[in-house]
Structures are given as structure tokens and as C-alpha cells.
């Protein structure tokens, strides 16, 4: 069925059929450090109608705590970290539910958010931002040393990725017996600033795939791994959830894989022409220009 433009004729049936709205963040709630117009009022209005509001982001640079701080800094003060599910959190939870040995370490190609979530889960993380200035040099009769106790390499969005990190992660995956290769997500690009799209974690993951000749375990969207935690917290059926996102291949596919209703907004990486292109195979149930359209539709007679 072709995606429906959200309108006064179909909005009420969608809203009444949903208990929990799942929102992506980049390109939906904000662009870089700029809140998208009308978002705060929309979230308050949805909550006032007795609905749950949850945030499911593939951006692993921040931890849940840091995302809650970002919401507050942008003037959205009602959000707690328990309502935020990030791919940094998902990476730590994947290790926890799979009984990753506490005596093994985790090498991180990514941001502080992954390291913080690993620490909260009881794991020892290495790498991250502190390896951003290190250099790998080719020297005759010299070995690049790496920690043999690393049992997992987590790769996420890393604005400071370099050759040192790639070599370190590659050696761990290829030479440490049983070492896991985990990707927070494979987004090609993202709205890291308000005016432009920037290379996403998919670029870093692709580099590691090339050097290790391995495919990663992906814990972020469109994988439904995080959905298990959402169901535990809210105890509602996925059919009573609606995923609101700006990406077809992550947000909308995640919602479809989990059995949720799906709503695409056009404030992020997907344009209306992308959506309606005959070559597009991923179609949301509904689409609209921006999240704040919900206010107008809710107030319409």
C-alpha cells in the first residue's frame, strides 16, 4: 500500500491506535544543535493525551545521560534518560545479555557515549576519543602492539577516526580468538549540523569490514535488538507503537521489522521525491513534512 500523506482524515485513526510514539532524534527532533521548530510543543501535546514518548537514536556519540542533557540544553526539560534508547546503550546491552566476560576488554572506535554506557554496564572500554591523536607508523622490524584481552570491538560514529584506530581494531578482530565485531549502526550520513549532512557511522563500519573481511553484529536500527528493552519498559504491543523517523533504511525499516506503525518526516535525510521514487522499496504507512504537523492535525475539527 502506498504511503499516505498525514491529514485530518487519517490522523485520528492513527493517533487513537497508538500508545507509544518512538522518535528518532537527528533530522526529526533536532539538526545538530538546533531544535526543529515546534518539537517541544508537539511532545508536550502528545504526552498530555496520555501517550508514551520514547527516543530511539542510532547516533552513538552520546550516552543516554548526555542525550538527556542535550534535550535540556535545547529547552526540552521533560525528557529523562530512561526514555532514551541510543545505539551506544544497545552496544553495551548486547554484551550484557550475551554474558560477555567481565575480564575481557572492549575496544571502541567511536565517541565518549559508548565508553560511558560500557562502564555503566560493568565493562572496561579502551580507545574512543583518547586515541584520536595517535598515529600508526610503518616501521621495519616493528610490530603494532594491541591488547590481547580485547574480546569485542565496537564501531560507531567517530569524527576523529584515524589509521591508528583502524589498525588497532583490525588486529583485535583478526588476531584475538573469538573477538566480536559490533557496529552501533550503518547510517551512511546524518544531520550532524543544521545545514548539512555528514558521513555517518556506516563509513567507519565499512572501513573495518574491508580490513577484517568480516560483517558486524549491528545493534542499532533497523535491527530490532533495542525493541526488546522497549517492550520490557512499556509493556505494550508493537502494533500499538508508531516509529517516527527521517530515514527509510533505518527508522522506517526498524518500525516495519518490529511490527510498528511508521511515520516518515521530511525534515531529515529523506525528501518527498526520494520517498515517492519508483525505485524506493521501503514505504512508511504515513508521511508528513515535520513533527509539528501533529499539532495542526490534532487541533483541526
Swiss-Prot record:
Keyword Transport recorded: no
Catalysed reaction equations from the record: 2-phosphoglycolate + H2O = glycolate + phosphate
GO MF annotation, one: protein serine/threonine kinase activity
EC number: 3.1.3.18
Active site: 19 (nucleophile)
Entry keyword annotation includes Hydrolase: yes
Disruption phenotype: No visible phenotype.
Enzyme class: hydrolase
A UniProt-annotated Pfam family: Hydrolase_6
Gene Ontology cellular component annotations, sorted alphabetically: chloroplast; plastid
Keywords, ordered alphabetically: Hydrolase
Entry-linked CDD domains: HAD_Pase_UmpH-like (cd07510)
InterPro entries documented for this protein: HAD-like_sf, HAD-SF_hydro_IIA, HAD_sf, PGP_euk
Function, as annotated: Dephosphorylates 2-phosphoglycolate, but does not contribute to photorespiratory metabolism.
Family statement drawn from the similarity comment of this UniProt entry: Belongs to the HAD-like hydrolase superfamily. CbbY/CbbZ/Gph/YieH family.
Protein name per Swiss-Prot or TrEMBL: Phosphoglycolate phosphatase 2
Organism: Arabidopsis thaliana
Lineage: Eukaryota, Viridiplantae, Streptophyta, Embryophyta, Tracheophyta
Gene expressing this chain: PGLP2
Amino acid at each position: 500500500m502506498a504511503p499516505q500523506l498525514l491529514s485530518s482524515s487519517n490522523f485520528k485513526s492513527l493517533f487513537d491506535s497508538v500508545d507509544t510514539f518512538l522518535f528518532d532524534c537527528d533530522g526529526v527532533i533536532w539538526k545538530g544543535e538546533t531544535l526543529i521548530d515546534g518539537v517541544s510543543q508537539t511532545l508536550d501535546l502528545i504526552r498530555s493525551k496520555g501517550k508514551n514518548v520514547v527516543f530511539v537514536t542510532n547516533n552513538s556519540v552520546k550516552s543516554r545521560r548526555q542525550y538527556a542533557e542535550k534535550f535540556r540544553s535545547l529547552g526540552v526539560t521533560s525528557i529523562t534518560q530512561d526514555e532514551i534508547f541510543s545505539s551506544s546503550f544497545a552496544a553495551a546491552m548486547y554484551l550484557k545479555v550475551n554474558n560477555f566476560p567481565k575480564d575481557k576488554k572492549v575496544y571502541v572506535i567511536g565517541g565518549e557515549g559508548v565508553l560511558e554506557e560500557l562502564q555503566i554496564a560493568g565493562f572496561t572500554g579502551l580507545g574512543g576519543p583518547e586515541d584520536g591523536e595517535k598515529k600508526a607508523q610503518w616501521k621495519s622490524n616493528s610490530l603494532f602492539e594491541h591488547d590481547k584481552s580485547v574480546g569485542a570491538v565496537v564501531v560507531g560514529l567517530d569524527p576523529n577516526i584515524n589509521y591508528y584506530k583502524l589498525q588497532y581494531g583490525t588486529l583485535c578482530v583478526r588476531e584475538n580468538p573469538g573477538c566480536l565485531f559490533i557496529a552501533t549502526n550503518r547510517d551512511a550520513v546524518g544531520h550532524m549540523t543544521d545545514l548539512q549532512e555528514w558521513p555517518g557511522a556506516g563509513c567507519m563500519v565499512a572501513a573495518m569490514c574491508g580490513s577484517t573481511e568480516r560483517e558486524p553484529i549491528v545493534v542499532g536500527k533497523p535491527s530490532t535488538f533495542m525493541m526488546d528493552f522497549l517492550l520490557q519498559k512499556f509493556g505494550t504491543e508493537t502494533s500499538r507503537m508508531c516509529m517516527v523517523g527521517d530515514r527509510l533504511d533505518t527508522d522506517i525499516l526498524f518500525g516495519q521489522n518490529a511490527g510498528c506503525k511508521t511515520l516518515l518526516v521530511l525534515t531529515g535525510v529523506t525528501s518527498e521525491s526520494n520517498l515517492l521514487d519508483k525505485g524506493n522499496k521501503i514505504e512508511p504507512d504515513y508521511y508528513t513534512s515535520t513533527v509539528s504537523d501533529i499539532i495542526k492535525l490534532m487541533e483541526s475539527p
